């Protein structure tokens, strides 16, 4: 099976599974927007590649795909729920929390209409530091400059869960960006 056909099947499955808002427009008038992440990350080019493949054969299926740079996983899920995005790339842990109404999604409740269409890649949580930083464990991050991720991103959400578990907040670090 060609890659294009594979992604067409994925997009069709998403459209048929209720991920998009229902409309009464004709096939020639269907538009799909994929929420991704920052333009320098992995999610944005992934969404762009999917849209290029979908748009390549747009004349036969009548769907036009566009990609939107966003804040990332948590933002994408919230925006899909609000009906402002059709599809979005999200870390699986944040999809799990949204579906079950836990963590950052507790106030909004379970989002049981949310569906996974495909997986891009595994996303382990990794902390790295320069060899000369003196950092050998998580406790050593206190008082250091730490990238905690962009607001709305899965990285930021995961870091906030970790900070809460450790009893930390942004003031724990010399600089939290």
Annotate the PLM regions.
Residues 5, 14, 84, 145:
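Conserved functional loop/turn residues at catalytic and ligand-binding sites
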Residues 107-120:
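A structural signal for short loop-to-beta-strand junctions that line the ligand-binding cleft
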């Amino acid at each position: 099976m060609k890659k294009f056909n594979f992604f067409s099947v994925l997009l069709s499955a998403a459209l048929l599974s209720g991920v998009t808002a229902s409309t009464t427009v004709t096939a020639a008038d269907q538009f799909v927007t994929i929420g991704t992440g920052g333009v320098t990350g992995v999610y944005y080019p992934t969404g762009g590649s999917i849209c290029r493949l979908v748009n390549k054969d747009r004349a036969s299926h009548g769907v036009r795909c566009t990609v939107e740079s966003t804040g990332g996983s948590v933002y994408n899920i919230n925006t899909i729920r609000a009906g402002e995005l059709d599809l979005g790339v999200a870390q699986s842990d944040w999809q799990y929390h949204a579906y079950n109404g836990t963590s950052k999604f507790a106030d909004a409740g379970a989002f049981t209409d949310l569906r996974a269409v495909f997986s891009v890649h595994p996303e382990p949580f990794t902390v790295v530091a320069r060899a000369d930083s003196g950092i050998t464990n998580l406790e050593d991050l206190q008082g250091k400059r730490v990238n905690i991720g962009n607001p709305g991103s899965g990285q930021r959400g995961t870091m906030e869960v970790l900070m809460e578990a450790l009893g930390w907040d942004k003031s724990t670090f010399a600089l939290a960006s």
